């Protein structure tokens, strides 16, 4: 039976999408002119990073998003999650094309700094697992939530990777914003694991 709920405020998703693209384009415009492949590599990473952030933060406002968009939260959430995964997948693929090597998909453990500098590599696998777990949540039951937690670790690794290696994160402003985003993600992680307050009992209720 079809739901009588009417989809609304879809324009907000369009605006958010334009902002994501605009921020990536703005940061890229601040850098010296590069070849199209390099621009694509950096822009895809920036847009994917933002969408992964939005998918994580949105999970803390399920009821509010359902009311605002008039559609199941999962649909809105998955738009950001799957699109973000697609973008952060295209990023290393183009890097591999540029380098002429598939080695860019392999994490490196030479030292802690090297691991974090190339943190985008393990982050990609973690994000892919988290998204896959969410898509298969009906098959694997409540266990999908534990796998989905990998998103938080992936975002932390991606933030370290961006700050230590990302060309567009060499200036102070992008660095500060990225660490503020990581702080927001960690706040969501903590908030979702705090005990929820019980609803106030009505006077006279037994």
Feature annotation, model-predicted:
Residues 1-206:
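Membrane-embedded alpha-helical bundles that constitute the cytochrome b-like, heme-associated redox core
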């Amino acid at each position: 039976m079809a739901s009588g709920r009417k989809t609304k405020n879809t324009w907000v998703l369009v605006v958010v999408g334009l902002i994501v693209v605009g921020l990536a384009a703005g940061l890229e415009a601040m850098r010296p002119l590069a070849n199209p492949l390099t621009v694509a590599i950096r822009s895809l990473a920036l847009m994917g990073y933002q969408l992964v952030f939005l998918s994580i933060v949105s999970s803390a406002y399920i009821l509010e998003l359902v009311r605002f968009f008039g559609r199941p939260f999962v649909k809105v959430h998955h738009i950001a999650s799957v699109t973000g995964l697609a973008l952060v997948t295209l990023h290393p693929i183009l890097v591999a094309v540029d380098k002429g090597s598939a080695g860019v998909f392999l994490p490196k453990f030479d030292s802690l700094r090297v691991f974090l500098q190339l943190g985008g590599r393990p982050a990609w696998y973690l994000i892919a697992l988290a998204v896959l777990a969410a898509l298969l949540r009906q098959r694997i039951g409540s266990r999908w939530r534990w796998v989905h937690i990998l998103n938080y670790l992936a975002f932390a690794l991606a933030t370290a990777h961006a700050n230590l290696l990302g060309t567009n994160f060499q200036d102070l402003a992008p660095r500060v914003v990225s660490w503020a985003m990581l702080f927001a993600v960690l706040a969501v992680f903590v908030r979702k694991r705090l005990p929820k307050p019980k609803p106030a009992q009505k006077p006279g209720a037994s």
